[in-house]
Amino acid sequence: MDNHEEKRQRRVRYNGTHPKVFKEKYKELQPDKYADAVAKVIQKGSTPAGMHRSICVNEILEFLKITPGQTGLDATLGYGGHTLEMLKRLNSKGHLYAIDVDSIELPRTQERLEGLGYGSEILTIKQMNFSNIDQIALESGPLNFVLADLGVSSMQIDNPERGFSFKSEGPLDLRLNPNRGISAAARLKTISQDELQGMLLENADEPNSAAISRAIISEIKKGIDISTTTQLQQIIKDALKFIPQNTRKDEIKKSCQRCFQALRIDVNDEFEMLYEFLEKLPATLAEGGRVAILSFHSGEDRLVKKSFQRFFREGVYREIAPNFIRPSTEECNTNGRARSAKLRWAIKA
């Protein structure tokens, strides 16, 4: 053996499934380095950590019928997946406005899209809530197409520092814009048991709302500061010990998901913002303008459905979706987060 032979470089050691630093936990957070790992996650029907896979892309584009020269709005920029596909359809002619309330993810998405060659001549990005769609219309003029994807992005869910998931330790925040409003932890300190129970019922249809709200308020009255996601998860878990052992694990998981959803909707005023958006929407559309809305919650879908139906009866919309559209079976099999999606559309008279 040649003693002068260069020593073989060992690969960088992966820190395991439970590292001290969250960023080292998932190989998917480094897609360029671990492309095979990302591919395996997608193949299993999951979304890689820190990434977002846009839903119903083909169905949305088929309906919006975007052509070069048009002006449109992506009312929920997020990761920019839908945005990118709409920009491709415009083919450097026309203009796309894209807005999002998230002050953390927006600049990252903007940088990514600019890196792909989509500058201010074709794309205008603003940090704002879609309830202010009328302000966009003042600048853009009548819109030929509008898309709103009401789902929380995977980047938000997978980042424990945002506090959107009970699966990881993190601050109990849940705000889409961390610079505005109060966190979920602060909200719990101001709410009564009756209010909390009503919130869990209205925002998430939680069947165990009475037991869970009673347990949460009991802890707060003891002077316990519920400031982390795992604290809240444990309280919910303890409150549901009465559930039979054979179904308890699944029921606790579902209740945790619903409770976090209910709190997120509350601290971000999501239903109120959606209602305001839907009310202002028709006035921003050009004649024949098309709008597609993707929802993931029965309460959101009801608001969209009722708004579309009312404006259709009043002659504001000339046509609306007769029923919601579900993602294809193939998409649901390859992206589990698509399973609860519902797509509705309307066309301005």
Swiss-Prot record:
Sorted UniProt keywords: Cytoplasm, Methyltransferase, rRNA processing, S-adenosyl-L-methionine, Transferase
Subcellular location field: Cytoplasm
Superkingdom assignment: Bacteria
GO biological process: rRNA base methylation
Record field: catalytic activity: cytidine(1402) in 16S rRNA + S-adenosyl-L-methionine = N(4)-methylcytidine(1402) in 16S rRNA + S-adenosyl-L-homocysteine + H(+)
InterPro entries (alphabetical): RsmH, SAM-dep_MeTrfase_MraW_recog, SAM-dependent_MTases_sf
EC number: 2.1.1.199
Principal location class: cytoplasm
A GO term, aspect molecular function: rRNA (cytosine-N4-)-methyltransferase activity
Pfam families: Methyltransf_5 (PF01795)
One term under GO cellular component: cytoplasm
Residues that coordinate or bind S-adenosyl-L-methionine: G80, G81, H82, D100, F130, D149, Q156
The UniProt record lists the keyword rRNA processing: yes
Keyword Nucleus (UniProt): no
EC class (word): transferase
HAMAP family per record: 16SrRNA_methyltr_H
The protein's role, per its UniProt record: Specifically methylates the N4 position of cytidine in position 1402 (C1402) of 16S rRNA.
UniProt family annotation: Belongs to the methyltransferase superfamily. RsmH family.
Name recorded for this polypeptide: Ribosomal RNA small subunit methyltransferase H 2
Species of the source: Alkaliphilus metalliredigens (strain QYMF)
